[in-house]
């Protein structure tokens, strides 16, 4: 697969912590506004610029993208972000509690994405993809990196270990306690070696950022069509990503909450559930293995165990698929979890206490605590050209936006 160093923009050293922000899609409007509060340099003002616009502004309007461009250009004009003197790559380490992961920051080929050398496991939602496409096209900037992974056992592991001995470009701990450390790789011979290493890696997988990667590839096709002298070397043919060895990743569960029992009484619901799976009262709040789900209902925890799963394909045997096919759809009437407003999803970073809180508040009737999907499952499904159910994986920690910017 193809990989390339880039001559991008980045924060000046003492502004990295002020600029770096969470990705656009892990916060709602109110949370985005709160994240940027008291932080005039926050990149949240670029990736979610609607937080600065008048109330009632359509979040997918051109006014939002134009304002994002103004905010981005202001960061550059005021000297808070600077362009590298020469093409480079970076190593990016994140430490959250006892977990550490280090990835390589570079640009990856939109052509590889289109040809499934970069493999996907999720469908995109049209409105969300259009939103990121218009932002990227208006700014001519990759505002946030795509989160990629490759199988273990490549030379990428050695690159990561060798570079971490050098002085860091950035090293700060964010408000949420996650430490971010960045090293720059600018030596031409090292960069050339990395390109050759990736020549021998057959594929990568989108772990997180399907809407970003799809919109970036779409931008590449747009600018190619606009350019009669297109050669393939232009910067728009490449998009910003961070790639991690699979063994370093931490996937947390992506839990479910449903607003009502679809007209069932508690007793009727439990009776139907008992026919769909093995049901036990007083279970642990988090399941201890696959084919198991913990459920919180009316102040009590129950254990659900799915049986008769032999012979199911890689997608149908996922816990999120078993729950959807045997409980959410037939009993609770959740036909399409992508669009049904009766269901919501809670990232595992919030823990089971959040599930109890949501149900106890009566905003939701029932919560389901999942066992995490594995990286091996993700890669097997992508290799088979299949699609995972929505909200199957929650990666943590999240890559920050604003630490690296690729322009084209």
Tell me what each language-model feature is.
Residues 1-408:
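Surface-exposed, charge/polar-rich loops and edge strands
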């Amino acid at each position: 697969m193809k990989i390339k160093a880039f001559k991008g923009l980045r924060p000046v050293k003492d502004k990295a912590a002020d600029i770096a922000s969470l990705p656009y899609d892990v916060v709602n409007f109110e949370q985005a506004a709160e994240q940027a509060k008291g932080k005039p340099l926050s990149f949240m003002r670029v990736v979610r610029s609607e937080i600065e616009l008048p109330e009632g502004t359509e979040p997918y309007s051109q006014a939002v993208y134009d304002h994002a461009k103004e905010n981005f250009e202001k960061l550059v004009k005021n000297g808070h972000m600077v362009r590298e003197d020469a093409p480079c790559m970076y190593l990016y380490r994140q430490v959250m509690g006892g977990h550490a992961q280090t990835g390589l920051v570079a640009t990856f080929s939109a052509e590889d994405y289109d040809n499934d050398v970069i493999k996907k496991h999720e469908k995109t939602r049209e409105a969300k993809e259009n939103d990121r496409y218009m932002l990227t096209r208006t700014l001519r900037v990759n505002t946030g990196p795509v989160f990629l992974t490759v199988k273990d056992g490549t030379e990428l592991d050695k690159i990561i270990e060798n570079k971490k001995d050098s002085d860091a470009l950035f090293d700060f701990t964010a408000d949420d306690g996650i430490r971010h450390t960045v090293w720059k790789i600018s030596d031409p011979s090292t960069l050339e070696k990395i390109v050759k290493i990736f020549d021998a890696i057959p594929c990568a997988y989108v772990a997180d950022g399907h809407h970003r990667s799809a919109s970036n590839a779409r931008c590449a096709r747009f600018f190619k069509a606009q350019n009669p002298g297109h050669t393939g070397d232009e910067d728009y043919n490449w998009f910003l990503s961070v790639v991690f060895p699979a063994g370093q990743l931490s996937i947390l569960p992506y839990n479910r909450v449903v607003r009502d029992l679809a007209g069932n009484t508690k007793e009727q619901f439990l009776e139907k559930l008992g026919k769909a799976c093995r049901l036990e009262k007083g279970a642990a709040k988090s399941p201890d293995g696959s084919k198991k789900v913990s459920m919180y209902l009316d102040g009590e925890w129950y254990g659900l165990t799915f049986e008769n799963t032999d012979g199911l394909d890689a997608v149908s045997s996922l816990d999120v698929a078993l729950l959807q096919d045997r409980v959410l759809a037939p009993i609770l009437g959740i036909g399409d979890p992508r669009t049904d407003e009766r269901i919501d999803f809670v990232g595992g970073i919030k823990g089971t206490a959040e599930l109890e809180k949501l149900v106890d508040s009566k905003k939701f009737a029932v919560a389901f605590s999942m066992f995490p999907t594995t990286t091996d499952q993700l890669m097997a499904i992508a290799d088979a050209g299949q699609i995972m159910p929505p909200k199957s994986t929650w990666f943590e920690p999240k890559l920050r936006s604003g630490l690296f910017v690729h322009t084209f």
